[in-house]
Each structure stands twice: as structure tokens, then as C-alpha cells.
Curated annotation (Swiss-Prot):
GO terms for molecular function: protein disulfide isomerase activity. It is found in: Endoplasmic reticulum lumen; Melanosome. It comes from the Eukaryota. This is Protein disulfide-isomerase A4. The gene is PDIA4.
Length: 643
């Protein structure tokens, strides 16, 4: 028994030894947890270090460097901060750098010190966008986080003085110069002003917010003019009656008022553009002619229509009516007036008459030398403008890029060649123009013009005539936006007459700029090209939503996935087509679908393709586009209630 017990004891001791070894080799749970915690703490410390790196504000020659990451944290507790937005490649920024460093050194000695910082606007795009930076360098002052524009010169003395002024504890922003108009004061202010610019805006409108600082800067500048030109604004959402009264349907809408009479504002929308435009608009719309010699020079050497009002004096009621009419057309034509009886005699008219005539180079035996209108006390300004517009074009005019909008009446017959009315080339120019006159006299319902081939090189290319090899080419532009090119051949009056006659009889095929027709067009969004616009968009049996886009347009790229989802959503509706067209590479063959920006979206309802509905909602998401379709669709297979 003893040997057996001894053997059992040995085995037991061996087992205990093995357990002890195993226990020593295995990791302790508490120990493992502690190690994991240490590792996590180290990682958190590393993250904190990274955050600290992001928030760290570096300094270069005394100027602090701010970026998208550290900006808000840095300015949060600062009373006043001077900022410069710059571009590394900007020459003006490089020239300004030493001056800015001197400014930083000076303001550092201020009590308390005022931080001076710079921001690379090309790399810190979020900040540049936030502060509407559009030029370099742009200087801003922050006062308790609020932006203060700096409009002075880029000198140490002027900038330091302005920053110190803003840093004073009792400094407050100056009141807005822009007047605020409501229904209570609108008529009083507007009726009393010789000229005033009024902006109708919506508080939520992005374009209005972008315009606001430029508008206020312009208001400040124009308030210093002599006499001052006031600028005002109307909240069109709160003042709905005023907005309706002046046909405000989009924002911002700007209108010029002269003693209460409204005129369209067609000028720029930035400070200097607004200032220059309003300064020009504040002058008289018509210039006085004192000497007969001036009229004679207009006739002999002029190259534009001559518009002259003949009146007794400035107190003549007809004169004021003429001024009102001239104001509405002052951007398109040059107006003149005279109180000279000698000039009236030369023009063969009595006082109170409006005379519209062409310089000698544009006169012909087929048309009157002048068109005269009698302006009475009962005459309306609209009748005067109608008379001017109706008679400003000669039988065959000179169409130029600068006045192309005068030639909006269609059909328009254009003859292209080297048009030059200078002394040396006038005879050659008139040689071809006279041939056009022979045809134009027989088609009074059409507008005829000659145009210089170099000025309209792009138009000739689109017509397929840029490489025709002919000295003279011709085309017809019709009211539907279509273009017809005359086959290149020897040009004469008979050839042009045959071309115009063929057009009148509907025997010509239009020239259409078009990408190739897609071979496979079965995707959720149909691709439309110039050659398929009529067959797809103008299909009378189908509702069509058409997007006009440009390949380079950022908004179009953002819209693309949403528009594709829209196509998928309605793919099962056979009588509804979701389509898109590159409007830069294809002709829109109907003038009812005007494309003035990208993207432009229209709904073309079945059976009424000449009245497309434009998508005006700023929210181009799936929900709003779907709602737009369902509001106007005539061919959805399900009812709107079900949708």
C-alpha cells in the first residue's frame, strides 16, 4: 500500500505544478483590461494631439494663419480681428504683404492687442464662400464675430485707423443707407424722387442675400453724388400688394422710378456697376440740338437712326411726354430734341412733332425719308415708343452684334459679306446692299439686313456657311427659332428672291445643330438632340419633362442623380417622358423653350406644346420635381390622388 500512496502523491504534486505553470503563462483578465485601457488612452491622446494640430494657429512674420478648421475657435472670444483673404498667385496680394505685416506689428502694440490674420482663399474655400470673397486681396474686420466690410485704401495708416475705430467699446455699425419702403411710405418716397432705384426682395432668396451687401455699398456711394441718388428696398413677401402692383414675380426685381413712374432696371448687380448705371440713368434721356449743322452731320455721316423731337420749350407738355418715352428706350436708342425753328423748317415739320429718319447711307427710293408723329397733350408715352420702335429700322439695315436685339422681328433675312461703310469700302458695301433692297421691297412682312461675316462668324458656322467659299451668303431666321441657309452660289437679286420665295412656300429644310441621334435611348431619362427635339419633346400625344443642361454646369451635375431617380420613378408611365438635352451642342427648335441659364426645366403638356410650363422652384429635389410633374401631367396612368 505504501508504494501506491507514494505514487499517488507524486502524481498530485505534478498536477499542482502544471496548474501553477499554466496560470503563470496565461494573461490575467484585469491585466488585459488595463493594457487595453492604456492603449485606448494613448489613441485618444493621439486624436487630441491631431485636434490640437488642427486648431493650432501658426504665425508668419507677425501675421496669424487661419483656416477652415481653426477659424471659428480662434475668433470666438475675440472682440476685434483684422482679416485678409488672399491668393498665393495674386500680384496685388504679394505687393500688399509687407504693408500687411507692418499693420500686424502696429496693432500688436495696441492696448489691448488686436490680432491680424490672413486666409488663403484658394485652399480655404469654405471661409472664402462664407465671406463672399470674389477678389484678392479682400480685407474684412470682425467685430464680436460680425463682419464689417473695409472699403478704404490698402495703406497702413488708413487700415489701422479703421480697425482702431471699430475696436472701441462703444462702436456700433452705421445705419443702413438703403431706404426701407412699405405700403405706408412707398408712394410718398417714390413720387417725390426725381430718380430712385427700388429692389423687391424675398428674405429667403439666395440671390437677394448675395445682392444685399453690393446694393448697400452702392447706396452709400450714390448718397454722396450731387444730387444724391437714393436706393430703397421692399420686402415683397411682407408687402404683397406692392409686389402685385408692380408685377413682381421673381426675386430680386429691381425697378427705377422717376417721379413715381416705373422703368425697368437692366444694369449690373454689383456696387460699381449699379453706381455707373444709375449715374447714367440720372441724366436726361434726350440731348438738345442747338445748331442745324448737327442735324446735317447726323444725316451725312451718321450710322444709326436719327430721333428728334421738335418742341416750343421745356414747358411744352409734349416735351415732357417725349422725355418719358425716351426714358423707357434710352438704353436702346439715342434721343435728341430741339427748340429751334430753323431746324424745324429744315425737317419740314411744325412744333410738337417727333421725327424718325435714317442717315443718308441707309435711305433708299423704296421708303420714306422720314416718319413724323404729332405729339398732342392726349398722346400717351407708349404711343411714342411704339412709333420709334416701328420706324427705327430701314428697309435693309446693318445688323451688328451691339444692336442685334433690334432685329428680333421674324422672319429675318440676313445677307452676310464684308460690310464696311467707311469711305474706301462704302461703294462695295452698297453694291451688295442695293441687290438686297430690290428683293426687300417686295416682302414688307419680312425684316431684311446685311451683316458683317466676321461679326457673325459663329452664326455662319452654325448655318454651315463658314466654309462656303462664296463672297456673299444668306440665311433666314424664322419665328420658331429655326434657321435656313441659302445654297452657296453666285449671289444676285434673283437668287435671293428665289430663296425667300421658297421659304415663304415652305419648301426649305431648316439647318439644325445636333449631336448624333443616340442608337440606344432606352434609359430612364431620354436623351434629346437637335434632330429629335420635335419628335420627342413636341410629340402631341405625350407629356414631356425636359431638362436643358450644359456639360460644364455644376448645378447640372448635382441634379443628374436626382433627375435619373425621377426618370426611374416614372419609367412605367408610357405617356410621360423624362428627357434631357445638352443645350450647348444642340438647337432648341422652338422659341417657346427659352434657355437663359442652366439647368432650365420645362414641362411640355400633351396637346399644348406651345405653352410649356417652366420649373421655377429653387428646390430641385425628387420630391419637388415629382410634385411639379403631378400638378401639370395630363397623361399619368394613375390619378393624382393615388400618387
Amino acid at each position: 500500500m505504501r508504494p501506491r500512496k507514494a505514487w499517488m502523491l507524486v502524481l498530485l504534486l505534478a498536477l499542482v505544478q502544471l496548474l501553477a505553470v499554466a496560470s503563470a503563462g496565461a494573461p490575467d483578465e484585469d491585466s488585459t483590461d488595463k493594457e487595453d485601457a492604456i492603449e485606448e488612452d494613448e489613441e485618444e491622446d493621439e486624436d487630441d494631439d491631431d485636434d490640437d494640430d488642427d486648431l493650432e494657429v501658426k504665425e508668419e512674420n507677425g501675421v496669424l494663419i487661419l483656416n477652415d478648421a481653426n477659424f471659428d475657435n480662434f475668433v470666438a472670444d475675440k472682440d476685434t480681428v483684422l482679416l485678409e483673404f488672399y491668393a498665393p498667385w495674386c500680384g496685388h496680394c504679394k505687393q500688399f504683404a509687407p504693408e500687411y505685416e507692418k499693420i500686424a506689428a502696429t496693432l500688436k502694440e495696441n492696448d489691448p492687442p488686436i490680432p491680424v490674420a490672413k486666409i488663403d482663399a484658394t485652399s480655404e474655400s469654405a471661409l472664402a464662400s462664407r465671406f463672399d470673397v470674389s477678389g484678392y486681396p479682400t480685407i474684412k474686420i470682425l467685430k464680436k464675430g460680425q463682419e464689417v466690410d473695409y472699403e478704404g485704401s490698402r495703406t497702413q495708416e488708413e487700415i489701422v485707423a479703421k480697425v482702431k475705430e471699430v475696436s472701441q467699446p462703444n462702436w456700433t455699425p452705421p445705419p443702413e443707407v438703403t431706404l426701407v419702403l412699405t405700403k405706408d411710405n412707398f408712394d410718398e418716397v417714390v413720387n417725390d424722387a426725381d430718380i430712385i432705384l427700388v429692389e423687391f426682395y424675398a428674405p429667403w432668396c439666395g440671390h437677394c442675400k448675395k445682392l444685399a451687401p453690393e446694393y448697400e455699398k452702392a447706396a452709400k456711394e450714390l448718397s454722396k453724388s450731387s444730387p444724391p441718388i437714393p436706393l430703397a428696398k421692399v420686402d415683397a413677401i411682407a408687402e404683397t400688394d406692392l409686389a402685385k402692383r408692380f408685377d413682381v414675380s421673381s426675386y430680386p426685381t429691381l425697378k427705377i422710378f422717376r417721379k413715381g413712374k416705373a422703368f425697368s432696371y437692366n444694369g449690373p448687380r454689383e456696387k460699381y456697376g449699379i453706381v455707373d448705371y444709375m449715374m447714367e440713368q440720372s441724366g436726361p434721356p434726350s440731348k438738345q440740338i442747338l445748331a442745324l449743322k448737327q442735324v446735317q452731320e447726323f444725316l451725312k455721316d451718321g450710322d444709326d437712326v436719327i430721333i428728334i423731337g421738335v418742341f416750343k420749350s421745356e414747358s411744352d407738355p409734349a416735351y415732357q411726354l417725349y422725355q418719358d418715352a425716351a426714358n423707357s428706350l434710352r438704353e436702346d436708342y439715342k434721343f435728341h430734341h430741339t427748340f429751334s425753328t430753323e431746324i424745324a423748317k429744315f425737317l419740314k415739320v411744325s412744333l410738337g412733332k417727333l421725327v424718325v429718319m435714317q442717315p443718308e447711307k441707309f435711305q433708299s427710293k423704296y421708303e420714306p425719308k422720314s416718319y413724323v408723329m404729332d405729339i398732342k397733350d392726349s398722346t400717351e408715352a407708349a404711343a411714342i415708343t411704339e412709333h420709334v420702335v416701328k420706324h427705327t429700322l430701314p428697309l435693309v439695315g446693318h445688323r451688328k452684334a451691339a444692336d442685334a436685339k433690334r432685329y428680333t422681328r421674324r422672319p429675318l433675312v440676313v445677307v452676310y459679306y464684308s460690310v464696311d461703310f467707311s469711305f474706301d469700302y462704302r461703294a462695295a458695301t452698297q453694291f451688295w446692299r442695293n441687290k438686297v433692297l430690290e428683293v426687300a421691297k417686295d416682302f414688307p412682312e419680312y425684316t431684311f439686313a446685311v451683316a458683317d461675316e466676321e461679326d457673325f462668324a459663329t452664326e455662319l458656322k452654325d448655318l454651315g456657311l463658314s466654309e462656303s467659299g462664296e463672297e456673299v451668303n444668306a440665311a433666314i431666321l424664322d419665328e420658331g427659332g429655326r434657321r435656313f441657309a441659302m445654297e452657296p452660289d453666285d449671289f444676285d437679286a434673283d437668287a435671293l428672291r428665289d430663296f425667300v420665295t421658297a421659304f415663304k412656300k415652305g419648301k426649305l429644310k431648316p439647318v439644325i445643330k445636333s449631336q448624333p441621334v443616340p442608337k440606344n435611348n432606352k434609359g430612364p431619362v431620354k436623351v434629346v438632340v437637335g434632330k429629335t427635339f420635335d419628335s420627342i419633346v413636341m410629340d402631341p400625344k405625350k407629356d414631356v419633362l425636359i431638362e436643358f443642361y450644359a456639360p460644364w454646369c455644376g448645378h447640372c451635375k448635382q441634379l443628374e442623380p436626382v433627375y435619373t431617380s425621377l426618370g426611374k420613378k416614372y419609367k412605367g408611365h408610357k405617356n410621360l417622358v423624362i428627357a434631357k438635352m445638352d443645350a450647348t451642342a444642340n438647337d432648341v427648335t422652338s422659341d417657346r423653350y427659352k434657355v437663359e441659364g442652366f439647368p432650365t426645366i420645362y414641362f411640355a403638356p400633351s396637346g399644348d406644346k406651345k405653352k410649356p410650363i417652366k420649373f421655377e422652384d429653387g428646390n430641385r429635389d425628387l420630391e419637388h420635381l415629382s410634385k411639379f410633374i403631378e400638378e401639370h401631367a395630363t397623361k399619368l396612368s394613375r390619378t393624382k390622388e393615388e400618387l
